[in-house]
Amino acid sequence: MLKTDIFTPSRFVGEGTVTLRGVKVPYHTVSEDNVFYDDEGKPIASIFSYSYFRSDVAAEDVKSRPVIFGFNGGPGTSSMMVHVGFLGPKRVKYGEVDHDGLPLPPYESCDNEHCLLDIADLVLVDPVGTGFGRLLDESKKDMFYGIEPDAEAFLTFVQAWLARYNRWESPKYLVGESYGCTRASTVAGMGSLSGSDRAYSVTFDGLVMIGNTVTVGKHFGDKSPIYSAVLAFPTLAAVNWYHNHPSNQTVEEFVAEAKGFADTEYLLALYRGNSLEEETREHIIERVMYYTGVSREYLERRALVLEDVEYRSQVIRQKGRYVSRLDGRITRPLYGPLLDEHKWGAHDDPAEGKYNPFFQSVLCGEVFPMLGIKTDRNFVNSHSLWSSWNNDIKGRNTSESLSAAMRRTPTMRTFFVNGWYDICTQIGILYYTLDHSDLPKDRVFVKGYESGHMAYLGEENIKAVSNDIYAFIMGKNPTK
């Protein structure tokens, strides 16, 4: 990775006010490096954090005030999306928008009237190698780049933060997005463990998982033990509902009906394969075409097996458009014959190409000055670490880590937030995970939103997601 700076630990302070639920809330901020050292005292890496503290809280009430640690995924992604997407007191402004409902340049920020700072202090986290966080010694990357090393570094940071600001007694929450759900479940499981090589003794009151990556496989990229086509079916049906309007039902009703078909008739048809009677096969083809919008030719060529990557070029093929992996509502033109689809892949996603410029413009151009951040250090929004990432978690999976944390902490609750149009982390995989794990159902909440991978995008969604997380932090059922 190219560098434009020499690392020097930094700390910046700022202050501001925001009106939340009719009350003017003053706050102060600390943005700082959290440096890791080797045995000789040499800095080897840093996590960068942005802390927001409500300023008018009585000293005796600070310890009982919740702390929310928010982060994104990747691995290799900064906290930018959750920071200016919905958690921070400044957010992206949806003023003049394009046909997908996303802002047009020039990009602007506005006060986030849905921020949770009135009820909790906020800590946005750039893990090692992301945002302003740095890996300073490449030979030490194995200490940070992997499911368990990443969680260990995160827990070490949390311990230091709690000690620095005397917040050990505060209720603690994790808000993770995408791979951040893997991080959150691993951190919660590891933090509650005793008798290990290192007992961190950090437990959490609640986890919010946005764009779920907690699975019963070793990691999210594993093939599921049943046909992935069945797990993808609810999301593909939602995308078809949005673009092709096959039914007057709501998206929730249409998806529920589609899931019922996929879990029964479609699953059995895939299992039987070529032994299907012709009449039954014809019925399955008609139903799959209706629910997902694909063509007969596609299904016959694929032996009835849907595949979500190819699906993105099929669902609105008649319009010459391709739908996004991150948000199936957002489209781009299909590639012409001279362009190689496999060469560009996820790097040419129509949603991500729109998200990143306006989020980074607002964060770097407006939020950082408000936080008092003045630095030549390059802000690394995202870079892929998959090739360097160690996915071994000693034979366990992420749902087992989360189950263990909830078993050891009987008051801990988990709230799963998923967009109906998220083809990247499909809600069907979440349903399957919950049906095949030991998670306590009375403390687990699931809600779908009319959005994509970043479920909070858009004026209606940021309000809905923020209000539901607010209810969750207040101890209520966020799905009611």
What is the meaning of each model-derived region?
Residues M1-V67, S79:
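Catalytic-loop region of hydrolases
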Residues G41-M143:
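N-terminal cap/lid subdomain of alpha/beta-hydrolase-fold enzymes
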Residues L117, P127, F144-L162:
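Alpha/beta-hydrolase active-site loop
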Residues R167-Y179:
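Alpha/beta-hydrolase fold nucleophile elbow
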Residues G176-G189:
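Glycine-rich nucleophile elbow surrounding the catalytic serine of serine-hydrolase chemistry
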Residues I210, T215-S224, S228, V294-K480:
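C-terminal subdomain of alpha/beta-hydrolase-fold enzymes, centered on the catalytic histidine
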